[in-house]
Amino acid sequence: MTAQINRQFLLARRPQGLPDRETFSYAETAVGEPAESEILVRNEYLSLDPAMRGWMNDAKSYIPPVGIGEVMRALGVGKVVASRHADFAVGDYVNGALGVQDYFLGKPKGFYKVDPSRAPLPLYLSALGMTGMTAYFALLDVGQPKAGETVVISGAAGAVGSIAGQIAKLKGCRVVGIAGGAAKCKTLIDEFGFDGAIDYKNEDVSAGLKRECPKGVDVYFDNVGGDILDAVLTRLAHKARVVLCGAISQYNNKQAVKGPANYLSLLVNSARMEGMVVMSYAPRFAEAAQEMGGWLASGKIKSKEDIVEGLQTFPETLLKLFSGENLGKLVLKVD
């Protein structure tokens, strides 16, 4: 019997600036058998996230960096094809840190089962996965929006931003999205129900904020950092809340990360700025998933997945995150 081959992308070097194909090495290994308490998963879909850029850095963070020569970390969903673990049986579908490869073999730490009969598998990487959990807890627990308030979201056409904006609408807020390009801004309003949009590629963000938020910004959900964060800080309302969810404009800097110049706006407006790491909310994922599932089933929230086929396309597909090409959740289908 011919041994099965596991294609893998390994971290070959730590990138300076944008990662490229040389950041990763490609390997093919034989698929092994699970030892005691291990499972073997055939990966079907992988989640491509801005956080992956941070995992490549040799720096202290909320989880250890990926080691040189290790399989590139990625969340994903797949099917258990062999198991020596009491909680997982052959045929189960699971969500976990599967890595950029055809098969995961190891202990299923943090893995949980998903049901493809209830929702398509890619949805468990978007609205029903870490993306949805991030949007849910960052907005509701940290941002604490109230009906009638103005919520501004950067990276609004991306995976987290598009869902966060829709949740804010459900809470009775006026929602303004910041995105790059007329097509994305149109999608925010026509498909996701945002009240307004600012095209940072083709207009001055400060002027757009003045137009769309005449009374100021009560909640700012920041996914990009940099100059856009600075622009929003100048428009904060009294007691505003700034949620730091990401800073994609800064992830590939070769120089030091740029800090906000207008931070004194927090002082004069009695506002607060708070960072958010989704894993802090892991004990509450079930409650959020239940509510998100209800919103999706009723059509109150729409989830958009940008699915690219082919494990071999991983290095190029990952770069779509940083060029702004993707619309919604970027997912890699393992062929």
Describe the residue ranges of each PLM region.
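C-terminal hydrophobic helical "lid"/dimerization subdomain
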Residues: 2-4, 282-335
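Short, glycine/polar-rich helix-capping loops at beta-to-alpha or helix-loop-helix junctions
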Residues: 102, 180-188, 257-263
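Short amphipathic alpha-helix with an adjacent loop that forms part of the alpha/beta core around
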Residues: 204-214
